[in-house]
Amino acid sequence: MSSILILLFSLFLFSSPSSSSRHHHHHNSGDTSPVNPSSSLAAQIRLACNATRYPDQCVSSLSEQGRVPPDPKPIQIIHSAISFSFQNLKTAQSKIKSIVDSSVGNLNRTNAANTCLQLLTYSEHRTQSTDQALTRGKIKDARAWMSAALVYQYDSWSALKYVNDTSQVGETMSFLDGLIHVTSNALSMMVSYDNFGDNVASWTYPATERDGFWEKTGPGLGLDPSTGLNLGFPSGLKEDVTVCKDGKCGYKTVQDAVNAAPEDNGMRKFVIKISEGVYEENVIVPFEKKNVVFIGDGMGKTVITGSLNAGMPGITTYNTATVGVVGDGFMARDLTFQNTAGPDAHQAVAFRSDSDFSLIENCEFLGNQDTLYAHGLRQFYKNCRIQGNVDFIFGNSAAVFQDCEILIAPRQINPEKGEKNAVTAQGRIDPSQSTGFVFLNCLINGTEEYMKLFKANPKVHKNFLGRPWKDYSRTVFIGCNLEALITPDGWLPWSGDFALKTLYYGESKNTGPGSDRSQRVSWSSQIPDEHVHVYSVANFIQADEWASMSA
């Protein structure tokens, strides 16, 4: 296979937006043969489907005989939409398994299909959890998990994009495109149900802050220290195992300690104490390993380091992570995650997280392009230091960064020539996803080395708060200190006018020479004071329920 194809596959996660947000063509996912339901049932289905991005497909799928019970409650309609998504997900998995079977000898296509299978397994877990959460009345959890299911389906579609060299792959991509629409519809109905309750007639087409729509929320607990909400790393944790470089304790590698953690550990935390030292390894915390905790001896003292990058044959951005976490409830404190791939070495992730209810405190993330991959679900970073240059905080999670130091580092072999750097590249693909990046009381600055370059010739060094990786990119900075290296424009387009009408980039009560909004791009926003509380740690990621220091 050509090296060009391998490289393209390695970059699939930075592909252009999928058909989930740009295409509106016909597809064959979940085609049904509707039987005319009663007029009252049909009216209920139509009203519910009016709250979706793909209402005709929604009506067709839910009108199938027996899909929705007679005289349904709104929550039953949503359950039916989730069930239909799950049914199509299982079909998609079968189609991709067939691609694996027919791709013997084709490394690129085999790798892409296997990546799809793994991603759709995650999507399956999250879809099942969504249905269970709705039954328990946990609507915020349901929305978070269905948002993640959609992320994995989109990434599966993207994984096939660069190996679309057979009709079988093309047909499977079309089916995945339809699956994305089906899942989007279920998620959209959840958002309306959360905001407007059982009155289906009041449910609305998906809208965002950019449209002037602000969700119903509670008080802004955790928006600033004065609220008294005591969130952070729990005290008094005792280690279950210890890792040390000399091998004189329980384990010599971090991965061996992770492997020793029990699977599906309930609510009990499994604490791994990682002694001072440099651990050269790539670590995976798999889906089955929940509530794993890393505790080091301090930033720069306990260091987990790797050097994988997306320029290597067969390596995707997702798989470059020095530490990659999928198991829920992951926590870390007092250590450094590092990827040493140089600034000319493509995407190279130091830390990637798909962990829901994840809390990282007093940790350091060092890299260049794509340092921190907050891929999906709810994450809370507190008192951390994050360093990089190109899109170095990216992904499609719901992540809050509080009291963090965000540092731009020199980017290229000849950095004195100048460059454009974006701190964030948030990747929300659907307006109903409960995802986005929130920065509270953070410092945005450069490393000492970078600031020397910047001050020597500020006109050639352009630094931005973010750029839109996907259509509905959402990032806000609240109460942050923006230093002089932030350009007056503030925000950078991705390409042309892509996403500029649908993104939401907001600022509120920032300080410092880079906070002046008088020259900001017209497609960024000042967050209305009465809506700033939407982005508190309690409202945005429900951290008051899972990140208590007394937990």
Curated annotation (Swiss-Prot):
Tissue-specific expression: Expressed in siliques.
GO BP terms: cell wall modification; pectin catabolic process
Binding site for substrate: 317, 347, 467, 469
Pathway assigned in UniProt: Glycan metabolism; pectin degradation; 2-dehydro-3-deoxy-D-gluconate from pectin: step 1/5
Region (Pectinesterase 51): 240-544
GO molecular function terms noted in the UniProt entry: enzyme inhibitor activity; pectinesterase activity
Residues at the site labelled Transition state stabilizer: 369
Keyword set includes Disulfide bond: yes
EC number: 3.1.1.11
Active site feature: 370 (proton donor), 391 (nucleophile)
Catalytic activity, reaction form: [(1->4)-alpha-D-galacturonosyl methyl ester](n) + n H2O = [(1->4)-alpha-D-galacturonosyl](n) + n methanol + n H(+)
Annotated spans, Pectinesterase inhibitor 51: 39-189
Ribonucleoprotein is among the record's keywords: no
Localization, UniProt: Secreted, Cell wall
Cysteine disulfide links: 384-404
Keywords (A to Z) from UniProt: Aspartyl esterase, Cell wall, Cell wall biogenesis/degradation, Disulfide bond, Glycoprotein, Hydrolase, Secreted, Signal
Signal peptide positions on this chain: 1-20
Any single GO CC term annotated in Swiss-Prot or TrEMBL for this entry: extracellular region
Residues with attached carbohydrate: 50, 108, 164, 445
Enzyme class: hydrolase
Family that this chain belongs to: In the N-terminal section; belongs to the PMEI family. In the C-terminal section; belongs to the pectinesterase family.
Function field: Acts in the modification of cell walls via demethylesterification of cell wall pectin.
Miscellaneous remark of the record: The PMEI region may act as an autoinhibitory domain and prevent untimely PME activity during transport.
Name by which UniProt lists this protein: Probable pectinesterase/pectinesterase inhibitor 51
Organism: Arabidopsis thaliana (Mouse-ear cress)
Gene: PME51
